[in-house]
Amino acid sequence: MSVVILVEDDEAVREVLVEALGDAGVRVLDADCPNKALLLVSSTPECMAVVTDIDLRARIDGFAVAERALEMNSDLAIIYISGQREHWLRRTMKSWERSITKPFDPGELVEVLRELESPAERPLA
């Protein structure tokens, strides 16, 4: 079973995603803020991915959360979620990164996680 850390400040969105991922057999550790998310990353070496909203209404955004998480565990896959497409226009995604624009079907997130979980689909950077 995959372990994923979900960082989403909107409680309703977080609950829907936790349920959908759980139904797909993913163990989800959720956080409503960057600090909690980074504590989870540091204490969960078996984590395979971080799913993070970009606009977290905090001092740091989802891109910074991902950067700090990768400093702790360079094997992580990162999935960014946001309602603002312009986030993707100013960023070149690496092989271990994906982006999903809100609103989206939770099944899309499950598919992206499965894709990133497959070593054949995740070439070295």
Task: Give the label of every model feature segment.
Residues 42-45, 58, 68-75, 91-92:
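Conserved phosphotransfer cores of two-component systems
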